[in-house]
Amino acid sequence: DVAGLVPAKDSPAFQKRAAAAVNTTAD
């Protein structure tokens, strides 16, 4: 798991996932 290597807030994958979650919630 690379989550421990890169801060979640700095992870592009996390940002993309978070954005998708926000968009889904907004819908």
Curated annotation (Swiss-Prot):
User: Keywords assigned by UniProt?
Assistant: Photosynthesis, Photosystem I
Does the record's keyword annotation contain Membrane? Answer: no
The ranges of region (Disordered) come to 1-27
Origin superkingdom: Bacteria
A biological-process GO annotation:
photosynthesis
> Listed GO cellular component terms?
photosystem I
Disulfide bonds listed in the record: none
Membership in a protein family: Belongs to the PsaF family.
Its function, per the record, reads: Probably participates in efficiency of electron transfer from plastocyanin to P700 (or cytochrome c553 in algae and cyanobacteria). This plastocyanin-docking protein contributes to the specific association of plastocyanin to PSI.
* Protein name, UniProt field: Photosystem I reaction center subunit III
**Which organism is this entry from?**
Thermostichus vulcanus (Synechococcus vulcanus)
Its lineage opens with: Bacteria, Bacillati, Cyanobacteriota, Cyanophyceae, Thermostichales
